[in-house]
Amino acid sequence: MIADIKKDAQERMGKCVEATKNQMAKVRTGRAHPSLLDSIQVSYYGTMTPLNQVANVGIEDARTLSVTVFDRSAIQAVEKAIMSSDLGLNPMSAGATLRIPLPALTEERRKDFIKVVRAEAEGGRVAIRNVRRDAISDVKKLEKAKECTEDDVRRFEDEVQKFTDAHIKKVDEILAAKEIELMEV
């Protein structure tokens, strides 16, 4: 029973780290990256559709994304969706392809993005700690039901703390890498 709780907690902590990493990937750096446009929704025939379902996003060079729209009639909708996103991008139309030059980030904008990334990292840490709290409370319930001993609970708490620290360290490493990436000019 305790092994199941531990396994579940480790899986959930791993998912927290992965979710934090995915959230940080959406924060724009100076480099072009297709995942930058993942959060954009396009009004396609009256339905809000993810951009990657109506177009192919690729990298043209270090500071330019290319968006190849599958249906030519949707080019204006895709262009409008990209312009209205809060990413500060201005696409240029070239037939069925949109070229999106990424402007260089100002020092102030970089610092704003670092604040956003740090908040995401803190959210990830809190989620990991919540998983730890849930796992420990589950084991304490087992102890109250006389299904495990107090020593088992102490041993479990120590083990959970070790892998909690390991997962938080992963989040901190992801944060450090993202901060370095953001501060590159």
From Swiss-Prot:
<dbReference type="InterPro" id="IPR002661">
    <property type="entry name" value="Ribosome_recyc_fac"/>
</dbReference>
<protein>
    <recommendedName>
        <fullName>Ribosome-recycling factor</fullName>
    </recommendedName>
</protein>
<comment type="similarity">
    <text>Belongs to the RRF family.</text>
</comment>
<keyword id="KW-0963">Cytoplasm</keyword>
<keyword id="KW-0648">Protein biosynthesis</keyword>
<dbReference type="InterPro" id="IPR036191">
    <property type="entry name" value="RRF_sf"/>
</dbReference>
<dbReference type="GO" id="GO:0043023">
    <property type="term" value="F:ribosomal large subunit binding"/>
</dbReference>
<dbReference type="GO" id="GO:0005829">
    <property type="term" value="C:cytosol"/>
</dbReference>
<dbReference type="InterPro" id="IPR023584">
    <property type="entry name" value="Ribosome_recyc_fac_dom"/>
</dbReference>
<comment type="function">
    <text>Responsible for the release of ribosomes from messenger RNA at the termination of protein biosynthesis. May increase the efficiency of translation by recycling ribosomes from one round of translation to another.</text>
</comment>
<dbReference type="GO" id="GO:0002184">
    <property type="term" value="P:cytoplasmic translational termination"/>
</dbReference>
<dbReference type="Pfam" id="PF01765">
    <property type="entry name" value="RRF"/>
</dbReference>
